[in-house]
């Protein structure tokens, strides 16, 4: 793993409007992400950060975000609206162990607006640490993002993230504590997520963890992340390269085929899923 540069910073705003359906605000406690997922679209923030580091090699903790959040929430009139953590970072990346910005922000929400809908999406089992705070939020859920169930394959694609098996253990723990937990199969990596038997195994482990709510999202071929992803496919996942090339040349056709497979495999494991993007 490359060295990650940590550069604490201060923010002017905490809650930012988001265009993600179902949410009014996003909350991003960090700029950058040490998970370094090769397919991540969030490296577009580099264009605005004046940082020369490559994606996955810098993290800027927004050290004053909890206090800014408290001021913003107190100024709100009427319902706060739904909040997603996070959209361009992982709120539970390694830096959170030291800076606890995510935990402090959740504390603020639990104190100032405990009825607010708060959904967390993470690749980290660290979220279990904050069980006590999550339980104080009356309308909170935790989503775990997984592209594959295989720890070794995942380590090639998500070198700084906790393993899928660690995430699933965390999901099972949260469910056992009464929290609402869901899974986000994202992105669908051509030739990998849908490799022979892989999709069935993924649904099997999700079911085994007790997860009943699942969402699916295809790969977004942003230029910068696509170059990184292609390099990983060539070096580590050569058996899937042809599928990636097929997807890039005809994404609609590929997704139509995948959507049919998704419907069949998910149904065989007790889910009922389709890919809206394939219509």
Can you say where each PLM-predicted feature lies in the sequence?
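Auxiliary Fe-S-binding modules of radical SAM enzymes
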Residues: 1-10, 16-17, 194-279
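Conserved Radical SAM active-site core
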Residues: 1-34, 38-143, 151-152
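Hydrophobic faces of well-ordered beta-strands that scaffold small-molecule active sites
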Residues: 25, 83, 118-120, 142-144, ...
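A general structural detector for well-ordered alpha-helical segments in enzyme core domains, enriched
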Residues: 69, 101-105, 130, 166-171, ...
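Conserved radical SAM core fold
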Residues: 84-94, 124-129, 140-161, 188-192, ...
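Short, electropositive alpha-helical surface patch
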Residues: 99-102, 135-147, 193-212
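Surface-exposed amphipathic alpha-helices with a cationic face
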Residues: 110, 135, 171-177, 263-267
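Conserved strand-turn element in the central/C-terminal portion of the radical SAM core barrel
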Residues: 160, 173-195
């Amino acid at each position: 793993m490359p060295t990650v540069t940590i550069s604490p910073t201060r923010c002017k705003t905490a809650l930012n409007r988001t265009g993600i359906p179902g949410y009014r605000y996003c909350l991003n406690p960090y700029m950058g992400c040490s998970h370094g997922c090769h397919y991540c679209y969030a490296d577009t923030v580099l264009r605005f950060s004046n940082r020369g580091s490559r994606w996955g090699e810098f993290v800027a903790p927004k050290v004053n975000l909890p206090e800014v959040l408290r001021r913003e929430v107190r100024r709100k009139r009427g319902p706060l609206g739904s909040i997603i953590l996070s959209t361009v970072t992982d709120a539970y990346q390694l830096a959170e162990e030291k800076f606890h910005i995510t935990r402090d922000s959740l504390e603020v929400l639990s104190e100032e607006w405990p009825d607010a809908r708060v959904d967390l999406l993470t690749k980290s089992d660290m979220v279990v640490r904050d069980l006590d705070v999550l339980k104080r939020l009356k309308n909170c859920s935790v989503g775990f993002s997984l592209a594959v169930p295989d720890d070794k394959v995942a380590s090639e694609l998500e070198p700084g993230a906790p393993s899928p098996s660690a995430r699933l253990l965390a999901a099972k723990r949260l469910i056992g504590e009464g929290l609402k937990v869901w899974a986000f199969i994202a992105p669908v990596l051509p030739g990998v997520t849908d490799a022979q038997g892989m999709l069935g195994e993924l649904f099997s482990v999700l079911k085994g963890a007790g997860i009943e709510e699942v969402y699916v999202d295809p790969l977004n071929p942003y230029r910068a992340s696509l170059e990184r992803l292609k390099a990983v496919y060539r070096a580590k996942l050569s058996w899937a390269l042809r599928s990636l090339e097929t997807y890039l040349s005809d994404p609609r056709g590929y997704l139509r085929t995948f959507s049919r497979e998704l419907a069949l495999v998910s149904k065989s494991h007790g889910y009922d899923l389709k890919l809206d993007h394939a219509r």
